[in-house]
Amino acid sequence: MTNQVTIIGAGNLTTSLLTAIHRKKFSYKINVIDTDKKKKLVLKKFNVSFFASYTDVLTESDLLILMVKPNNYIQVIKEMNPYLSEKVVIVSFMAGIESSLIKSKLNHNVPVVRCMTNVTISDSESHVFYHMKPFSNKIVKRLDKFFNNFSKLKRCINEEDINKITALYGSGPAYYVYFNQIIKD
């Protein structure tokens, strides 16, 4: 393993995750891919490698974290497919997109783990809930190695539980952040 993680998407949840990572100062190389080049300035303080298009960094990554809007997932997977390797684990934080849908769009048979957390992860006070099918202790160890540096990893037996967690735990704080941004503006 290379201790390299690539995050696709640079929105609020990515910023929260990077804040937690930055505070803990652990030894992962972090890449972020987002087509909005303005996000590079926002992420500069986190000391990450920023890319505006898909590159070979996907091939070299241990974990590929999808943090894009669910309506963009088909295009994202289509664009990243040529760069995927068999060793990567895809970790999806996309609300409402089941693992089977992601797997059906991939060119490679790689593990897909569906996760959810919320913006409080920036304070290292959050849980990361996950579901994978089939279950693999080897993959859980990879997830533990990364996420347990700044959060608590919790397994969901059923993928439906991730949908419930998304509604209550993921979306609630996100709407609060959105509401506060509207008030400020």
Regions found by a protein language model. Name each.
Residues 116-121, 166-177:
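Glycine/serine-rich anion-binding loops at beta->alpha junctions
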Residues 101, 105-111, 127-164, 175-185:
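Internal alpha-helical scaffold of NAD(P)-dependent oxidoreductase catalytic cores
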Residues 12, 37-38, 71-72, 97, ...:
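Short alpha-helical
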Residues 3, 28, 48, 88, ...:
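A structural micro-motif
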